[in-house]
């Protein structure tokens, strides 16, 4: 067994252990690099960052992450629209017995869910633009599509079907952003900050939800179409922020190297790290990315068929991406965010809009905590603690709703004390969700796949998120109308399944580059042992030597056992 292996076995925190360092290794390729250059990656230190360095990184990444604001804004304003009188008058039905307009369960479900259908399709359609046009231009295109959808919705008048068509197109753009923005963030972010920077996407989603709640709260007393058209009109401001921002942010160095644009790739890495393109750290990063690209090319051209490859572990990662994004919706979060105003009116609150603003505030500030800690705690711990915390809160929320909210039956008055308790545990639930699953699910999907199939795999994973959001958004009015707060127990069962899946199947990737994550999967490390895995480059051995050493060690153990 090598000295590197001994160090791994004897040290608990092996990723930071003082381990054997290999001598410089000559490069075996020359695409875009000086043939005489020697890359001694183990001895190259990352650039030291002061306050200005961190500020530059976050400012460059923020316009990309603002793509998360678009679906968040829709969630916030839609939750208010379904309770607005003028909106119901324009797109609802008239009830002669009461003399009021209302939205049927079908129409309400479609109003909420059509956006999700558009997002699912948009992610699948537009993700491939990232490989042909680049990440930045692809984001600009999907934002323009989003603006077209907003125009169709605003121009709708007493035509609910026109509004729904606009909602789908609106979703196409937002869905494209849900794939492209985390993708670009994960590819330009420094390894030690990647989790927090990808989490900015979710932070902006919560910011969009919060401001959406505030906008409908501000327009709810208008007695004309401005009640809902003003919040929709603000979409153009958010879209312009993203388009202008794309002029300032660097392109993905991985995309640039795949296109043989090596100088631009080094400039991109240098810009995000605020150093010279000739800095040794920049050369090392470009060298590692180039190695990964060349290794992927040796496997042939990318295809949809490759997503089902067992040999390269892509299928395993695709299943993980699909399940993590599915579980994100099965936490039950959109039960509160889409129908929050309606839910809290049912617990006796006269102004559900105000409660929605409170929930939006908790959601936003909790996500700020996630941005700060996700690169310190790790992905697995965040997801495990989050599932356990949400499970406890949902059990209490559902139990109070079932047993205590209506002490004299569903037709009787609600208990104010029980209603207040439900709001408190809803806030605890949102805290657990926003600090864990909300950002980490996007991180896991953004960093799990090799660049060769990344756009395809991310689009499928994210489409599953939107598909489940559609199902929950559409069927929730029917389910709650039938089983009321027993619905919460359905999500409890899902949370139990989530906890078990993460523990047994999801590896830890904190502190690893995207290329090192590829090696983690190739070596077949058990997920519950993955936190102590050390990349070959830090052990002082190559990837091939690592695989050979692992096989030899297994043979040695088998021989020893037979000898006994």
From Swiss-Prot:
Database matches in PROSITE patterns: MFS, SUGAR_TRANSPORT_1, SUGAR_TRANSPORT_2
Biological role: Probable glucose transporter.
Main location: membrane
Family note: Belongs to the major facilitator superfamily. Sugar transporter (TC 2.A.1.1) family.
Origin superkingdom: Eukaryota
PANTHER family (alphabetical): GALACTOSE TRANSPORTER-RELATED, PLASTIDIC GLUCOSE TRANSPORTER 4
Segments on the Extracellular side according to the record's topology features: 74-109, 158-167, 216-229, 351-356, 403-424, 484
Region Disordered: start-end pairs: 530-551
TM region(s), chain numbering: 53-73, 110-130, 137-157, 168-188, 195-215, 230-250, 334-350, 357-374, 382-402, 425-445, 463-483, 485-505
Signal peptide: none
Protein name, UniProt field: Hexose transporter HXT13
Topology in membrane: Multi-pass membrane protein
SUPFAM superfamilies, A to Z: MFS general substrate transporter
A GO MF term: carbohydrate:proton symporter activity
Localization terms from the record: Membrane
Cytoplasmic-side positions: 1-52, 131-136, 189-194, 251-333, 375-381, 446-462, 506-564
Alphabetical list of NCBIfam families matching this protein: SP (TIGR00879)
SS bond partners: none
Positions with biased composition (Basic and acidic residues): 541-551
Record keyword Membrane present: yes
A single Gene Ontology CC term: endoplasmic reticulum
This protein's record includes keyword Transcription regulation: no
Keywords: Membrane, Repeat, Sugar transport, Transmembrane, Transmembrane helix, Transport
GO biological process, one term: mannitol transmembrane transport
């Amino acid at each position: 067994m090598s000295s590197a292996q001994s160090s791994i076995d004897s040290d608990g925190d092996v990723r930071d252990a003082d381990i054997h360092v290999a001598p410089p290794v000559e490069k075996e390729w020359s695409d875009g690099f000086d043939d005489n250059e020697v890359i001694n990656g183990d001895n190259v230190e990352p650039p030291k960052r002061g306050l200005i360095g961190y500020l530059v990184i976050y400012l460059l990444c923020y316009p990309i992450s603002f793509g998360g604001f678009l679906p968040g804004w829709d969630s916030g304003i839609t939750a208010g629209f379904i309770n607005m009188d003028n909106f119901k008058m324009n797109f609802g039905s008239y009830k002669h017995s009461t003399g009021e307009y209302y939205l049927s369960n079908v129409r309400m479900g479609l109003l909420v869910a059509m956006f999700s259908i558009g997002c699912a399709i948009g992610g699948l359609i537009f993700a491939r633009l990232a490989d042909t046009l680049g990440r930045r231009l692809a984001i600009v295109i999907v934002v323009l599509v989003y603006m077209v959808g907003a125009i169709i919705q605003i121009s709708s008048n007493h035509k609910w079907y026109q509004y729904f068509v606009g909602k789908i197109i609106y979703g196409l753009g937002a869905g494209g952003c849900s794939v492209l923005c985390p993708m670009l963030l994960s590819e330009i972010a420094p390894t030690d900050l990647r989790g927090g920077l990808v989490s900015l996407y979710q932070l902006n989603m919560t910011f969009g939800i919060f401001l959406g709640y505030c906008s409908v709260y501000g327009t709810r007393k208008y007695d004309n179409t401005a009640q809902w058209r003003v919040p929709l009109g603000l979409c153009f401001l958010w879209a312009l922020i993203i388009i202008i921002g794309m002029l300032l942010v660097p392109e993905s160095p991985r995309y640039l190297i795949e296109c043989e644009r090596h100088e631009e790739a080094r400039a991109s890495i240098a810009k995000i790290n605020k150093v010279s393109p000739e800095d040794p750290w920049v050369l090392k990063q470009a060298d590692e990315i180039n190695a990964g690209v060349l290794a992927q090319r040796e496997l042939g051209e990318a295809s949809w068929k490759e997503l089902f490859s067992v040999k390269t572990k892509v299928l395993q990662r695709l299943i993980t991406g699909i399940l993590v994004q599915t579980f994100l919706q099965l936490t039950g979060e959109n039960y509160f965010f889409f129908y929050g105003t309606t839910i809290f009116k049912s617990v006796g609150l006269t102004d559900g809009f105000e409660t929605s603003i409170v929930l939006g505030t908790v959601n936003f500030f909790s996500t700020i905590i996630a941005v700060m800690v996700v690169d310190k705690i790790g992905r697995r711990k965040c997801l495990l603690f989050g599932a356990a915390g949400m499970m406890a809160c949902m059990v209490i929320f559902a139990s109070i709703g079932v047993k205590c909210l209506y002490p004299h039956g569903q037709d009787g008055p609600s208990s104010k004390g029980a209603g207040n308790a439900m709001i408190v545990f809803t806030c605890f639930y949102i805290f657990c969700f926003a600090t864990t699953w909300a950002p980490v699910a996007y991180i896991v999907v953004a960093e799990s796949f090799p660049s060769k199939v990344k756009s395809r795999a991310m689009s499928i994973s994210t489409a599953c998120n939107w598909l489940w959001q559609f199902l929950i958004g559409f069927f929730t009015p029917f389910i709650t109308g039938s089983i009321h707060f027993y619905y919460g127990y359905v999500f409890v069962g899902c949370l139990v399944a989530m906890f078990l899946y993460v523990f047994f199947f999801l590896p830890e990737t904190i502190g690893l580059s995207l290329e090192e994550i590829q090696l983690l999967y190739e070596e077949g490390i058990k997920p519950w042992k993955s936190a102590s895995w050390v990349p070959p480059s830090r052990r002082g051995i190559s990837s091939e030597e690592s695989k050979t050493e692992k096989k030899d060690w297994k043979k040695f153990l088998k021989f020893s056992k037979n000898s006994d």
